[in-house]
Regions:
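Membrane-interface junctions at transmembrane-helix termini in multi-pass inner-membrane proteins
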Residues: 9, 70-97
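Short hydrophobic/aromatic segments of transmembrane alpha-helices and their interfaces
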Residues: 27-29, 73-75, 86, 102-103, ...
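Short alpha-helical transmembrane segments in multi-pass integral membrane proteins
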Residues: 3-68, 110-149
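Mature extracytoplasmic/luminal segments of secretory-pathway proteins
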Residues: 1-2, 93
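Hydrophobic alpha-helical transmembrane bundles that constitute the permease/transmembrane domains
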Residues: 34, 71-78, 97-106, 125, ...
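A short pocket-lining beta-strand/turn micro-motif at the edge of beta-sheets
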Residues: 89-91, 101, 107, 118
Length: 149
């Protein structure tokens, strides 16, 4: 991706093509992983904590809630890598910093107060969703600079 932008700066069609293919691929994998996670939640929980019904229910429920993260996080990882490839380390670092520290810390402290134990399980997905808003904003704001949309 970086080579397409730097060395072949006039090849905006290829940059757009790579961007759109990447988004489709990430979306396909995200949905696939989410569906697989939902389907294997019961067998996986049984394998690890099948000996305790209460712990089994908590684990299965938690895994199903956490799996919503799989729908989102690939786009954020790609967004950070995308801006790195375009030689915009500042936006890449900002996305990563917000994703891994600021948003996760904020929601893991706040959501359990509002949702109890489910808030803990949902905190990563909510942090990823907040990061997706930031990533999407940067992608829209920089579209005319890099011409990938």
């Amino acid at each position: 991706l970086g080579d397409v932008y730097k060395r072949q700066a006039n090849n905006q069609d290829e940059l757009k093509n790579l961007f759109h293919k990447s988004i489709r691929l990430i979306g396909t994998w995200a949905v696939s992983l989410f569906i697989i996670a939902q389907l294997i939640a019961t067998p996986l929980a049984t394998l690890f904590v099948g000996y305790d019904q209460g712990l089994f229910e908590l684990t299965r429920s938690g895994f199903r809630l956490y799996s919503f993260t799989f729908l989102i996080n690939g786009f954020n990882i790609y967004g950070s890598a995308f801006f790195t490839a375009l030689n915009n380390g500042l936006l890449s670092a900002l996305i990563s910093f917000l994703r891994t520290l600021v948003f996760q810390m904020a929601v893991v402290l706040l959501l359990p107060l509002l949702l109890g134990i489910n808030g803990v399980w949902c905190s990563v997905a909510i942090a990823e969703l907040l990061t997706l808003c930031v990533t999407g904003t940067f992608i829209v704001l920089k579209r005319n600079t890099y011409h990938y949309l």
